[in-house]
Regions:
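Mobile cofactor-carrier "swinging-arm" domains
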Residues: 1-114
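A short loop-to-beta-strand scaffold at the N-terminal edge of the catalytic core in hydrolase folds
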Residues: 119-128
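Conserved HGGG/HGGXW glycine-rich cap/lid loop of the alpha/beta-hydrolase fold
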Residues: 127-171
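Active-site loop/oxyanion-hole signature of alpha/beta-hydrolase fold enzymes
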Residues: 163-207, 211, 362
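Flexible "cap/lid" loop of the alpha/beta hydrolase fold
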Residues: 213-217, 223-254
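Conserved alpha/beta-hydrolase catalytic His-Asp/Glu region
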Residues: 250-310
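Conserved serine/cysteine hydrolase catalytic core
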Residues: 287-335, 344
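Catalytic histidine-centered segment of alpha/beta-hydrolase-like enzymes
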Residues: 348-361
Length: 370
């Protein structure tokens, strides 16, 4: 085998560096391609880097607690045929010629951000280039389009991607009206109209799953496929009032931290920077009011009841669930349409698309026919 570098990945638009927090393997140990190799902490979340190839881990270049730019050399994988001198030369050459990635050096397929007027609102939308029906990504309660940072690149390799900050979230207008599901879906639909999108693969997480389903109902023929990840609003499913209330009301890091930890199976995934980013968002004008309106509407349950009564009108869907979800309880599978498929993800909480991104990406790619 050739000498294979392990490099600092780029997860999402805003990532320009990462910190090594844990190595699962030591130099000399044999790797299997795809197994967990190390954990990297970003400003959003901590995630695992998988081994890029099978073979001995010949050298670890980046130590624990070391912060390095995207693309930097972390380790080297190579079989015994490669001499130590060859490994040393490879590392020296890499370090000598390495230039940190910049926006100017990013590929033409990189996501571009824009603000799109939707009635009296403005929505922030990220898009990648390409031909064909796009993948439309709709995040959950309290999140933004960066919630898909571990999914965008994998999906963009197969189809154009449109990621949207829902009303009340991210950089979009904070006006959500009374927070009704129909209003959120209508705003997304108008944004897609502005982009000229007539057909799309709709993918929604949590509240975004309910929005995606409602959008598919309100615009027959729009959804080429429908993927719902830990979705709210399905039969037998309940959204945690404790989470919604805690998220909406928390004003300090020490209060928000245990709330965010409910999102994931491993609380260590919630970074200090992620907590601070959420607090910064909540301090924006209108953000608290938007969250309160959306939370009250979800807890009222009327929109979800209306959605459940029309599931049979929806196209076949993939529902991705985690048994460790502490925010949205699993639906009654027997009450779902017979054409729907359910996939369970082990070792994840409410955020399987972040916690187990490779598995979720593979499921989505299969669903969209990639």
């Amino acid at each position: 085998m050739s000498i294979v570098p392990v490099k600092m990945p780029k997860w999402g638009l805003s990532m320009d560096e990462g910190k090594v927090v844990h190595w699962y393997k030591a130099p000399g140990e044999r790797l299997t391609e795809g197994e967990d190799l190390l954990d990297i902490e970003t400003t959003k979340i901590t995630n695992t880097v998988e081994a890029p190839a099978s073979g001995p881990l010949r050298r670890i270049v980046a130590g624990v607690d070391e912060t390095l730019p995207v693309g930097a050399l972390l380790a080297v994988v190579a079989d015994e045929a490669a001499s130590d001198a060859a490994i040393d030369a490879f590392i020296a050459d890499f370090q000598t010629n390495f230039t940190p990635e910049t926006e100017a050096a990013e590929s033409e397929g990189a996501m571009q951000l824009r603000m799109v007027e939707v009635g009296e609102r403005v929505l922030r939308i990220g898009t990648t280039g390409g031909e064909g029906a796009p993948v439309v990504l709709l995040h959950g309660f309290g999140a933004d389009l960066n919630n898909w940072l571990f999914n965008i690149d994998a999906l963009a390799a197969a189809a154009p991607v449109v990621a949207i900050d829902l009303p009340g979230h991210g950089a979009s207008s904070k006006d959500v009206g009374d927070g009704d599901l129909a209003g959120l879906a209508a705003a997304v639909g108008e944004a897609l109209d502005a982009l000229g999108v007539r057909e799309a693969h709709l993918i929604g997480h949590s509240l975004g799953g309910a929005v995606a389903a409602r959008l598919a109902l309100d615009r027959p023929g729009l959804a080429r496929s429908l993927t719902l990840i830990a979705p709210a609003g399905l039969p037998g499913s309940q959204v945690s009032a404790e989470f919604l209330t805690g998220f909406s009301e928390a004003e300090r890091a020490r209060d928000l931290k245990p709330v965010l930890e409910q999102l994931v199976a491993d609380p260590a995934l919630i970074s200090r920077d992620m907590i601070e980013d959420v607090l910064k968002f909540k301090r924006l004008d209108g953000a608290q009011e938007a969250l309160a309106a959306l939370s009250a509407r979800m807890l009222g349950g009327g929109d979800f009841a209306a959605l459940r009564s029309r599931l049979a009108e929806l196209p076949p869907a993939l529902v991705i669930l985690s048994r460790g979800d502490a925010v949205v309880s699993p639906p009654d599978e027997a009450a779902l349409p017979a054409s729907w498929r359910v996939a369970w993800i082990d070792g994840a909480g409410h955020m399987p698309h972040l916690e187990k991104a490779a598995e979720v990406n593979a499921l989505i790619l299969k669903t969209i026919g990639a």
